[in-house]
């Protein structure tokens, strides 16, 4: 006889990078539970933070005034980390509310998050912190991250993020580390592996645009 292990379900909350205009708005239109989350968050961001998270997600304006200070990004302000992180937090809680509303939320599922997704996992399924606290926390986190890097008039910084796929390039982890270190020394520009996401398969890299460009050339 054979034994079949029970199916395991997991709810995984991602970090930044998947944000886009209109995300979550289909659920906003079709799910009362999701809409309630978005409207609760929007009321809080309007009153306490000086902007509308619904406006950010729906319209993705290239410029937004927050307490009289212009926030600018040529691809839309949803790509500024302080707004990205709030949008991701609200989206996560809205998705969970929609699942719960439909009776499809598994209380025995594994829950995890990556980077800002850790906060969202705690907020959406951990029953540890209320929505408003999560929104405030990730907004302040994003503001600090934003302030750490100089930006031009378009809201762009001189830094970029990339991904190394070592198994595609025939590299070991040590090879990848050495390559990144060598390029940083050659260019005199910051370049560093910041997350070893999947061993031997996916590493996140950040650095100045010139150094990222050299890394791309070496891997092609």
Language-model segments: residues:
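Helix-rich "cap/lid" substructures immediately adjacent to catalytic or cofactor-binding pockets
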Residues: 2-112, 205
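Gly/Ser/Thr-rich loops at beta-strand to alpha-helix junctions
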Residues: 17-18, 118, 210
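Conserved short alpha-helix immediately C-terminal to the canonical SAM/SAH-binding motif I
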Residues: 37, 120, 141
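Active-site signature of alpha/beta-hydrolase-fold catalytic machinery across serine-
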Residues: 94, 122-124
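Generic structural signal for well-ordered, non-membrane alpha-helices
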Residues: 94, 116, 214-217
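Beta-strand segments within the central parallel beta-sheet cores of soluble alpha/beta enzyme folds
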Residues: 109-114, 136-139
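Glycine-rich nucleophile elbow surrounding the catalytic serine of serine-hydrolase chemistry
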Residues: 114-122
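Alpha/beta catalytic cores of group-transfer enzymes, especially the acyltransferase/condensing modules
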Residues: 124-220
């Amino acid at each position: 006889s054979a034994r079949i292990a029970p199916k395991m379900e997991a709810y995984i909350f991602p970090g930044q990078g998947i944000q886009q205009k209109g995300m979550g708005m289909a659920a906003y239109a079709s799910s009362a539970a999701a809409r309630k989350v978005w409207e609760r968050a929007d009321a809080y961001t309007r009153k306490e933070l000086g902007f509308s998270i619904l406006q950010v997600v729906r319209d993705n304006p290239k410029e937004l005034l927050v307490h009289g200070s212009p926030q600018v990004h040529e691809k839309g302000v949803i790509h500024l980390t302080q707004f990205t992180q709030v949008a991701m937090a609200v989206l996560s809680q809205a998705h969970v509310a929609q699942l719960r509303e439909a009776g499809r939320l598994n209380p025995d599922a594994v829950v995890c998050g990556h980077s800002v997704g850790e906060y969202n996992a705690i907020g959406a399924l951990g029953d540890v912190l209320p929505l408003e606290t999560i929104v405030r926390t990730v907004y302040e986190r994003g503001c600090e991250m934003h302030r750490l890097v100089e930006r031009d008039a378009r809201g762009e910084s001189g830094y970029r993020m990339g991904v190394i796929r070592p198994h595609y390039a025939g590299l070991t982890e040590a090879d990848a580390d050495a390559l990144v270190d060598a390029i940083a020394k050659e260019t005199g520009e910051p370049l560093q592996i910041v997350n070893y996401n999947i061993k031997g398969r996916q590493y996140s890299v950040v650095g100045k645009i010139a150094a990222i460009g050299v890394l791309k050339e070496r891997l092609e």
